[in-house]
Amino acid sequence: MHIRDILKFNKDKYFGGAVQANWFYDADKVSAIADSYVFHGPKYHGVNQQEWQNTSYKLNDTATYALKLAKRASETESNRFCMTIAGYGTGKSHLSVALASLLSGHDEELRQLVLKNISVADRHIREEIGTYLHKNLVIVLNGMRDFNLNSQVLAT
């Protein structure tokens, strides 16, 4: 028996090469990038939370993280800061384009693509996210480039 007999790769979700966060602004790329991101829900999160109980941060699966961001974007009086930390090549830029497409609301078709992908990971999280969505000003910055934050914000 071979691995290929047990597992199948979803070629519809394959995106070749590294994703750049600023591709959120590229109309030719953003749809393919946002649609190809594969969210995982709490049932498929490969982290044992007991191992991380003594840390100051909580690890989240990507569907739960999307919900957390949608909730925070709806709040008006709290600190809405969230940080994503992960190693090189783990999909942070890909995730950022998908989340920006979801939260900005500038393109409803794009938002629905992302919601569909979240639904595959966890239908209940997708339904809850829907109650928090509205249009947001989303500014995506590529931290790998040397940039002046003030000029980047003014350019948007």
Give the label of every model feature segment:
Residues 7-20, 57-63, 111-124:
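Phosphate-binding glycine-rich loops and adjacent basic patches that engage nucleotide phosphates
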Residues 8-13, 29, 43, 58, ...:
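Context-gated lysine
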Residues 1-52:
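Extended, charged/polar low-complexity intrinsically disordered regions
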Residues 79:
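Short coil/loop residues immediately preceding or within conserved phosphate-binding loops
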Residues 5, 64, 68-71, 127, ...:
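Charged/polar, solvent-exposed surface patches and flexible loops
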Residues 16-31, 56-59, 63-71, 82-87:
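Helicase P-loop NTPase motor core of nucleic-acid translocases
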Residues 34-75, 115-119:
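N-terminal pre-Walker A segment at the start of P-loop NTPase domains
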Residues 53, 57, 82-87, 94-156:
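P-loop NTPase motor core
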